[in-house]
A protein has these predicted regions:
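Type-3 copper protein
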Residues: 1, 5, 87-88, 103-104, ...
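Generic start-of-chain signal for non-secretory N-termini
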Residues: 1-31
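Alpha-helical structural motif
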Residues: 13-14, 107, 111
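Compact alpha/beta protein-protein interaction domains typified by the UBC
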Residues: 22, 27-109
């Protein structure tokens, strides 16, 4: 069974955590939830100064046992910490250190730190 169907409380927690992040920052914009078949996706943008990064977060079938994955929505290389040209961003939270209580909002914050940090270099 799909995680967000079998654990609607966790689905609500994810939506609320991301809504709180969006409301509390000015850099998280254009948040949009959608389904691709039965896959839950989140489109969003990180905006900092003159930079705008369009991203998509994929919630895996086995979430929250494994973390969501964050990709560039445009299929281009954004970071030296990215697997391939259109691959996922290598963030602080990975399958080897992921904890069940962590959220997609934390993944978005990690993507923000990575992209803003690299753009400042």
């Amino acid at each position: 069974m799909i995680w967000w169907g079998s654990d609607p409380g966790r689905g609500l927690l994810e939506r609320l955590a991301i809504a709180r992040l969006e409301e509390s920052t000015n850099w998280l914009q254009n948040v949009r939830w959608r389904l691709d078949g039965l896959k839950l996706l989140l489109d969003f943008e990180i905006v900092e100064d003159v930079s705008r990064w369009r991203l998509v977060m994929h919630y895996p079938d086995f979430f929250p046992s494994i973390p969501p994955l964050v990709f560039n929505a445009d299929g281009e290389r954004l970071s030296g910490h990215q697997y391939g040209l259109s691959g996922e961003l290598c963030l602080e939270f990975r399958p080897d250190n992921w904890e069940l209580s962590w959220t997609g909002a934390m993944m978005i914050e990690s993507a923000h730190r990575l992209l803003v940090g690299e753009s400042a270099e």
